A protein has these predicted regions:
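Carbohydrate-active catalytic/glycan-binding domains of CAZyme proteins
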Residues: 1-202
């Protein structure tokens, strides 16, 4: 995930320890026009991936994939881009992956994530939740399943591209091949579990 702040351009990414197979969130500074060695910025005793950053009330947050912890783990940036702190653990017992900021309503942040089919984790279905601020605390409200059917393309591949025509980036898999391709869809026409209108060829 590319992010620009305070005159710096950085890339947040998953860095995997090949010995353990466990990933952490790392950051590579590209401000000077070349790629610096990624530095770990968030490490936990469980696998992490898919760093999703978003700004909320003048603060930078990240919600990486922490499905192995069976919870949503939210982090706040204390000093950009290398220092982060835990901001809350939510929806314990859920195994949700690849959260993407979908919309903002009255200061609340709505996310679209995916849950696995317990019989085959190549198949997923969408689940939504919302972060709210109340009494100085961040609370999470479960908005429930958005689609009932497990499919091979009910999983986001990156943040919504906010342009004249906002685009949702959808990951497509095939049986036995994870992340076979991606698909760009008009956000307002994208209805999980239904036929998706393609903007660009896969």
């Amino acid at each position: 995930l590319l992010w620009e702040k305070d005159g710096k351009e950085v890339v947040f990414l998953e860095r995997v320890d090949r010995r353990t197979g466990r990933g952490c969130i790392a950051c590579a500074d590209i401000s000077e026009g070349f790629w610096r060695e990624p530095v770990a910025v968030i490490e936990e005793p469980f696998h992490m991936s898919f760093p999703m950053c978003f700004e909320w009330q003048n603060e930078l947050y990240m919600i990486p994939e922490t499905e192995m912890d069976q919870a949503l783990n939210l982090y706040r940036c204390v000093e950009f881009p290398y220092k982060w702190e835990g901001a809350g653990i939510y929806m314990k017992g859920w195994s949700l992956v690849d959260s993407v900021l979908w919309s903002q309503n009255d200061g609340n942040m709505q996310f679209l994530a995916s849950e696995y089919d317990p019989k085959d984790d190549f198949y997923t279905r969408y689940h939504a939740y919302e972060f709210q601020r109340a009494d100085g605390q961040i609370k999470c409200r479960d908005l429930g399943r958005i689609s009932d059917e497990y499919t091979l393309r009910s999983r986001m591949a990156g943040p919504v591209i906010e342009d004249k025509v906002p685009l949702a980036i959808v990951q497509r898999s095939t049986p036995g091949i994870y992340g076979y391709s991606i698909q760009f869809c008009k956000k307002e026409e994208y209805l999980p579990g239904r036929i998706v209108k393609e903007i660009l060829p896969s």
